Amino acid sequence: MLPKSLAWWVPVLLLGAWSGAAFAVQTDPIARLVHQKRYGEASSTIEARLARNATDPTALAASVDLRIARGEPDELPQARIDGERCVEANPDSSVCAEALGNVMLAQSRAGGLVAFVRNAHATRDTLERAIRFDPMNYRARVTLMVFYLDAPFFLGGSEVRARELATEARRLDPDLTRLMRAMCAFDEGKLDEAEQHILAADLTEYELVQGSQRELLLTLASAHLDAGRHAQSGRLFQELSRRLPSSEHGPYGLAQVARAQGRLAEAALQLERAAAIAPRPYIYKTLGEVHEARHDRPRAIAAYQAALAGVPPLARREQKQVTAHLAELKRR
C-alpha cells in the first residue's frame, strides 16, 4: 500500500466554498484569487469587505485561507485567531467552521505528531459542523474525508465514514463523488480503482478542486513510472496535460517517461514545454541532466545556471549537485 499522509492532500484541497443547487458550483471571488495565487488582490479585497462589515464570514474565512496558502508558519497563529474570530462572530457559518478546521490542520502539519494528536478531535468536530451547517460545502467534505482516512481510529479516524462521505456527495454531484472515491481507493492502495474513478470524473467546472485531481493523477502516473510501466505512466501524464494544460506536471512527467526509455531528445522537448509553463528550478535541473547526457554542453550549462538562479531555490543538497555538474562542464 502506498503511504498515506495528511500533509500530502491538505495543501491541494479546494480553496473555495460551494453553495446553491445540486450540480451548480459558485465560487467566491476571493477564494478564486487565493487559488490563483493572486495574493495581493485577495488581501485588498478582504480588507475592503471587512471595512464594510468587520464580521463578514466569507472575508474572515478567506483571510484564514490566504495565510495558510502563503505557507509561512509564522502566520498560522494569526490565522488561528482569525478563524476563531470568524466562528465567534458567525457561530452557524459553514465557511467559518471550515476555516478554523483548515488552520488546525495546517498547525498539525507544521507541528508534527504531537500537534496532530492535540488538535485531532477538535479538528474533526469543527469540520463536521461545517458540513452540518452546509451540506454543499464540498471543500469541508473532502477535507474531513482526508482526516478520516489519515487519523488513527482512537483519534477519530474512520475509513468507513470516509466512504460514507463520498457516497453522501453522490446525491449532490457525481463527479465530485468520483474524485472522493478515487482518493479513498488510493488510500487503500487500490490503484486501478483509483485510476478508474479519477478518469471518469469530469471536473472541468471545478477550478478549485483541480489541485486534488492533479496530485492524484500525478501520483498514479509516477507509481506506474517507478514500476517500469511506461505506457500506463505516459497515458496518465498525457491525461494530466490534457485536463490541466496550465500545469507543468504533465509535460514534465512525459519527459521523465521519455528519459527512462532513453528518448533524450523527446525528454528535452517536453522539459522545454514544462519550463515554458512554469520556469521552476527543478525543471531546469532535470533539463541540464538530459542535455548533459546528450553531450550538449552549452545547453546543459545554460539549464544548470537557470536552475541555480530560479525561485523557489533548490534544496541545499540539489544546489551542491548542480554546482558540481556546472563546474565540471565548465572545465571541459
Spans of features found by a protein language model:
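Residue-level recognition of tetratricopeptide repeat
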Residues: 31, 65, 102, 109, ...
